[in-house]
Amino acid sequence: MSNPKQLTFPWNKYNKSSFDSFYASKLNKHLLSLLQNNTFKDDLLIFGTKDSGKTYLLQALCNYFSNQGKSSFYLPMKQAKELSVDILESLESMELVCIDGIESIVGNKVWEIGLFNLINRSLNSENRLIFTSSKNIDVMNFELKDLDSRLRKIQSHELYALADDEILSALKHIANLRSIELGSKEAQYLLTYANRNISDLVQILESLDQLSMEMKRKITIPLIKEVI
């Protein structure tokens, strides 16, 4: 198989995900510190709810590696499993492999074996594997017991979703990083009337920023009403 970074996949697209723009709550600061520690090279299994930011974090980690001139590969398992399991071949040659959503292949014998084989090959290389899942390994129930055993030996960390009282701080943090002027009243209005999912809020924020520039208007509550 060709070097993975030479191939084009439907999920490969430029993104600006970065650790700086990931709002780290108190509960997540230790995990963020581990991921940015170049001397910490253990494999990790990160689990958390749908809205905890697992995908963003993996993409930020890949960008972090790329910015240091290191090879990285991001694989969203839910999409990848529709392709041939051969996609896993040679991934151990990458310095970092991030596999997102491994719960998607529970019960899929071919993919469970493929993932198990990748982990085994990686034991003999210097690459690093980072997995994410919406569930703790204790409740995933992989049919391949050898895979289950391998994953249980990997250090696991929970990525906690933002608490309600942290969402406002996160929204302001992201707005400041992107030089978007968002007043306190406007931010509070967004939290009151829009979906409080941080990824949805960021999409709304980006739409507001674009619209405000096109209309040469500040982001106000009337403008927010036009978007949401």
Where does each model-flagged region fall?
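Walker A/P-loop nucleotide-binding motif
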Residues: F40-L58
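Short glycine-rich substrate-engagement loop in P-loop NTPases that contacts/grips substrate
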Residues: F65-L96, V106-E112
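The conserved phosphate-sensing helix
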Residues: A194-L208
